[in-house]
């Protein structure tokens, strides 16, 4: 999914938190940053003023403004020209410092957004860098029910009618929490982290066939819903046409594998849906098994090792 953010959107999202004022270049509100993970040489999203390797948001603190003041007239004009020519998303001055008139005029003439904040430079840098990195991170929407089970994020998937929503309802009644139904959105906020959230339209809602749309917060209380969770496991429900006949190895290890989501391989456990199976208990067990495996505890491997040792002892 291609993502972007404009200067106006960034300003509106951070105005209150960073006490921002827009003092010049109002016509540049449509300038935007496009997410482009394939461009290894793209500029940094936010940073202190850098003329050689410019940032998309250039922050001017006390030292940066003092450096500008130390330049002679020609050098100062050339430096401001360089700052403007690369078309940054915005310029941000920290600590409510007064804006130099020549910089303000250049920003107005070039339609470069110029903001002033009461925050210190490092606060601007931290907040803007984090917000931009998260906003522009790769993201994808997957079909399924995303829940918190035993404190880890579990995505329940399966074809239509496989019982995902009914399973989610049973898990809710057992004390687990809903993050998103039907269309959870996952953002890769770090090389090994997928953060799952719920679209605003579907917040707190769960659709169950025969019952319609349920408000989970109203039915089960505030603790039954979760704003976001990291995706750690996928449980896939499948309806086999015939009784499955797993091999001996599958009977030991279960039907496990992985699913590629963005740049990560997420562990996946497949559960056959058949009459009489308690899917809620099986899903809880699958989650506990995954937690054990992350700690290096694998019951199947332990059994195979015991079996091998027993055969070795009995071999003459």
From Swiss-Prot:
Coiled coil: none annotated. This is HPr kinase/phosphorylase. It comes from Xanthomonas axonopodis pv. citri (strain 306). Both phosphorylation and phosphorolysis are carried out by the same active site and suggest a common mechanism for both reactions. Residues 272-277 are annotated as: Important for the catalytic mechanism of dephosphorylation. The gene is hprK. Homohexamer. Catalyzes the ATP- as well as the pyrophosphate-dependent phosphorylation of a specific serine residue in HPr, a phosphocarrier protein of the phosphoenolpyruvate-dependent sugar phosphotransferase system (PTS). HprK/P also catalyzes the pyrophosphate-producing, inorganic phosphate-dependent dephosphorylation (phosphorolysis) of seryl-phosphorylated HPr (P-Ser-HPr). Keywords: ATP-binding, Kinase, Magnesium, Metal-binding, Multifunctional enzyme, Nucleotide-binding, Serine/threonine-protein kinase, Transferase.
